[in-house]
Every structure is written in structure tokens, then in C-alpha cells.
Amino acid sequence: MFDKVLIANRGEVAVRVIRACRDMGIKTVAVYSTADADALHVQLADEAYCIGGPRLAESYLNDDAVLTCAVKSGAKAIHPGYGFFSEKASFVRDCDKYGLAFVGPSAEVIDSMGDKDAARRTAAAAGVPIVPGCDLLKSPEEATAEAERIGCPVLIKARAGGGGRGIRKVERVEDAAKAFIEARAEGEAVFGDGECYMEKFVAPAHHVEVQIMADKQGHVFSLGERECSVQRRNQKLIEESPAPCLDGHNDIRARMHKAARDLARAVGYEGAGTIEFLYSDDGNFYFMEMNTRLQVEHPVTEFVTDTDLVKWQLRVAAGQPLPFEQEDMPVRNHAMECRINAETPDFLPSCGTVTALRVPGGPRVRWDSAMFTGAKVPPYYDSMLGKLIVCAPTRDGAIRKMRSALGELVIEGVSENSELQLDVLANDEFLSGMYHTDLTGHLYADE
């Protein structure tokens, strides 16, 4: 096992990894920007190094600065958290060059799954169902022709896209050319890659993802699934496990899990990963993408499978085999997570200083955050203040527990979105368990 790990991230995920390392007797190295000098991850780490100014390009996305700190500190591995370097293949290759273990899959796997068009083809070759569509589009004229062939509505997607960026929905064939130009431009601007492909828009649909863990010895396991259909602007708000849309459909659940494991084996996956599917009410499911990293919502899976995914990431990266079998991974109880974001009721970012913080407690209530009274919420980074996670024997019990926990949560000094979460938890469609990805559009104008 590694004796020292550098965490190439900030905020709650950096704190999460530091705590896991502490439990395992591993020393930790934090990196931080000038805006995060007093941040919690800096306070908790055994060592901390400033790597630049407040903007991401000056600090957290500065490959050379992070790698220099890792080598100088004597760290043996780098944990990327999520975002930042977690899915950057060139950074993994740099880690290899400097003799640093990267806590995640190989650069080759990240490359193959990061190209969404290539990932579709890989999934199809592995026997995993994919959404009807086409390969890379060459021109606006071809986009129009393919939209007519596939049938609207369709989605035009940047192959390097993610997080809802580089996507355009096309309702009419005559709008396909303009949408292609826009998606291509956004893909080029945000990801440095303007290549786009087209998929049929599946609606109504559920967003269901299967958690995968794989070791270097070739063992691949699925650890339940999560439903992530409560979204706004393609950003997840609430996640739960098991997926209520699969209740009574254990045959479909089993096929979905097998498809996820088959794909992970096909690409030679190592570590924690997630295969995302669209699931339609007619019982069909389709591969969307593979996230080759730890997910924000991983605590939901940890609750229902009684595992620590971060610790197993570290063990796998150190070459240890997974010591269980698939049948050792039953899903018990029901877990739910609400993302608490710093935003106004009008969905605008909220920055400032946390002047008061009261965190809910009780059995099976978890608050993952880097917030404390006096913590600064700067304008440069993701707006998530923390994640509130609960677990109960039933879904109804988990909803009640989450409502209670949200009612206890107090964050002053910045605006946050717990009222939106309570609105969702009171919605009849959500309560039925048969909600879809358009749920928040029924509650709020999504403009």
C-alpha cells in the first residue's frame, strides 16, 4: 500500500479522500489555490502546497504544478477525485512517466471511453445496447440528412462532451444544421474537440447508472445501480439506490448489470467506474457513456452495499485484488442523496462566507462537505456546498429521513437550494418512483 498520496482536487471530494487515507494509515498531500488557502482540505492534510492563483487554469488544472508537488513531497500516488484530472489521459501518462500511481484506470481506457463516439462503437461490439444514431457527422448537410433518417427528436453531441455541454436537441429536421454548428462550436470551445455525432432522443426516459469496481487481476463486479433522473440542465440534483424504475423488473436489472460488467471487461477496466444507461418505460435500456472515475453520488452506493469505494480505489491502484464475489454484493435498504448547491432561488450562483452552519445528524445520515463556519465560497469553482445522504429500510423511509435532514440543515451567508430539493421530495411524480429526466421541468422553468 502507498505510504503517501497526493489529492489533486479541492472541496468535499478532497476531504473525502483525505479521510479515507487517514483510516488506512496513509499520509496525505493537499494542493490548493490562493483562494483556498484556508479551505478544509488544506487543514486536514498532512502537507499542503499552494500551486497558483484562484482560477482553475492557474492552479487546479496546472499539470506541471501538481506533478511537481507530488514528486517533491515524496507521494507515491495521485488521487484525482472527480473533475479536473480524473479523466485526462495525458495526465495519467505524465504520472506514469514520473513513477506515480494514478488512482484510476489506464490512459488508454480513459481515451477510449472519453471519445463518446468511439465508446458507442466499443459498447456495441461488447453486445451492450446503444441508442439508435450515427457516427461522426461531417457537415451541416449530413446532420440534416441523418436527422431525417433517424427521425426527430434527436440529440447532436460533442464526442468529447460531458456535464451537459456540447449537446443540442433537434425537434425539427430543418433545425439540424444550425444545431450541429452550435454543438460543434461549443465542443471546440469547451473541450478542444468539435467532432459531433447524433443519437435518437429517448423520452420519456430514466437515467440509471451501474457502479463498477474492477481490479488488476481481471475481476469485475457491479455494486448496485443508482437512479439519477432528477436533473436540471443535465446536472444531477438527487440520486437514489436502488433505482425505483426497476422495481419489479429484476430481469432487466440483471441484464443491465451484466451489460455494464461486460463493457468494463471489454475495455480492461481497473478501479471504480460507472456505466450510464437510458431506460425507457417499454423495458429497453441503452448505453449512454462510461464515467472512468469516482462519481459525486458514490456515497449512495456505499450505504446500500456497505462498502467504501474510495478505500477500494486505493487498494486496487496498489495492486490488491478485490476479495469478494458478485453474490457478496447484495443491495440492502434504500439510500438517497441531495446535492446542496450555492445558488439563489433564480438559479444564479451565490458566493460569500458561510456565517453559520448546522449539519443534520442521526443514524444513517451523512453530510459530505468541506464547509465550516467561516468557510469562503469563491466564484471560481463548482457551486456544490455539500451532499446530504440518508439511508433507510424502504424508499418511503428514506424520503421521510431526507425531508427531516433537509429541515435540520442550516447554511447562512450564502443562498442554497434545499427548498428546491424539498419541492422535488413532495412531488407526486417523484413519490411514485416513476419519474423521468424531465421532472424538474414540470416544477420550474428550465431557462
Report each predicted region and the residues it spans.
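An N-terminal boundary/leader segment
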Residues: 1, 163-164
